[in-house]
Amino acid sequence: MKKHKEYSSLDLSKIGEEILSFWNNNSVFDKSIADPLRPENFTFYEGPPSANGMPGIHHVIARTIKDLFCRYKTLKGYTVNRKAGWDTHGLPVELGVEKEMGLTKEDIGTKISIEDYNKACRVNVMKYKKSWEEITSQMGYWVDMKNPYVTYDNKYIESVWWLLKQLHEKKLLYKGHTIQPFSPKAGTGLSTHELNQPGCYKNVKDTSAVAQFQIIKDEKSQFLFEKTNQ
């Protein structure tokens, strides 16, 4: 008896649908992480996507690479738990909501309550959740979508605080000073990723005012002439 089905023609879409159907109907992924004969764990952390943006081909490529490692470790006898997650922290979410509602940061707490503003952000940040779930299933990416972690959830935030406490107690955190890009409009610092958002930089023309004064060279003004050609 043949273990695997043979195909006379390569209709890749049809073959893919049949394999996905077999995996789903037989709960293959669930069985692979619940097998008692797999006592050793391989730890895998799923970097969460942001569900307020549509999935793209680069996400498919990255997930394919991650899936290869997880499936290989599964074949080697490891239990490979992989929990899905949603990245919900980020300035782009806030700016998107403010643009849709015609608000500025100054309007929060006056024209709109903080509670309503937060609700709008929670809705916006999960805007394309269904699209992500569909493409995850279609590409056969094995990850636990039933019990995802959500970064705005208090349990997740508390776990991050706990980790920071551990770092602090081990004296791995220190206070320092560094120059960071800042957005006056948003009232917050900007990450490298946020600096690459469309519309962050614009070429503008401005008028510079230059005033000239005569300087008398004496002891009081001597510092102005130091290390110059005078």
What kind of region is each of these model predictions?
Residues 1-230:
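N-terminal, positively charged nucleic-acid-binding surface of large information/translation enzymes
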